[in-house]
């Protein structure tokens, strides 16, 4: 019986490895196709030879100029921000044990949006510092949620979710109030609130890339801790985990990732919610 169980377990593990490998290969292929379509399709269609010339650096034509200054930054920003929001959503779902959790439930997106809209309306000259302001707003939302959830030892996933939803609604209401009272700034503010990757510059890419790399490193490093945490606080504490510290570290990481993403692309919440579920469906639930 033991031998049969071991063989069955080994077969399941081999099947999981094959599925993960196949998923990775298909994902990479789809990524390359998406990158090509993003660079080639637009108001001016760019041929494959022009894209290849840009990659190899052999020519300096109008097409390569368009790729380098417009489409490549936009494409990279989409990849980085999508990855950042997906990781933020995964981390939120892990620490709250709520399958519907995303940076929005932590009050992060709403806090970042509120600060940016407020500064855009009152002090437009500070618009160049939107990324820093968004991070400050995200920390404001996250810290408020953390404070309302109770003391460090009394924080529970339910308290965190309820406090996050309350703060999200509060900041969203404040943002809408600012828009209503300042009609002159409506066009600029509404364009940003809708979300867009238009006009992304290389400087912004260079600024946000380290945050994604840090998030990937920390997520991989804490993967086992997050898996243990999903078993429940009592079991995690019984295994020697300091659940409060883990949640605090993950919460700070979520705040930074969401704040940076919101400052560049606007308050996008769906990516952080749906991507973790897609990946769990394909490769399993182990963090």
Locations of the language-model features?
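Alpha-helical transmembrane segments in inner-membrane proteins
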Residues: 1-287
């Amino acid at each position: 019986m033991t031998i049969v169980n071991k063989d069955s377990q080994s077969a399941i593990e081999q099947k999981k490895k094959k599925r993960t490998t196949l998923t990775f290969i298909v994902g990479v292929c789809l990524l390359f196709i998406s990158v090509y379509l993003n660079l080639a399709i637009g108001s001016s269609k760019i041929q494959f030879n022009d894209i290849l010339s840009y990659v190899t650096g052999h020519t300096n034509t109008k097409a390569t100029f368009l790729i380098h200054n417009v489409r490549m930054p936009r494409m990279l920003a989409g990849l980085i921000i999508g990855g950042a929001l997906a990781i933020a959503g995964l981390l939120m779902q892990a620490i709250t044990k709520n399958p519907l959790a995303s940076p929005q439930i932590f009050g992060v997106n709403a806090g970042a949006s509120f600060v940016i809209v407020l500064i855009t309306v009152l002090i437009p000259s500070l618009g160049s510092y939107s990324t820093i302001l968004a991070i400050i707003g995200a920390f404001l939302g996250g810290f408020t949620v953390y404070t309302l959830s109770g003391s460090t030892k009394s924080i529970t996933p339910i308290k965190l979710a309820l406090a996050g939803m309350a703060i999200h609604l509060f900041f969203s209401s404040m943002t809408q109030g600012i828009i209503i009272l300042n009609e002159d700034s409506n066009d600029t503010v509404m364009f940003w609130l809708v979300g867009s990757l238009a006009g992304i510059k290389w400087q912004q890419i260079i600024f946000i890339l380290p945050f994604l790399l840090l998030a990937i490193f920390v997520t991989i490093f804490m993967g086992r801790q997050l898996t243990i945490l999903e078993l429940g606080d009592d079991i995690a504490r019984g295994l020697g985990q300091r659940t409060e510290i883990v949640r605090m570290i993950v919460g700070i990481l979520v705040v930074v990732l969401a704040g940076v993403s919101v400052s560049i692309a606007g308050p996008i919440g769906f990516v952080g919610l749906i991507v973790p579920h897609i990946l769990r469906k394909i490769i399993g639930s182990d963090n």
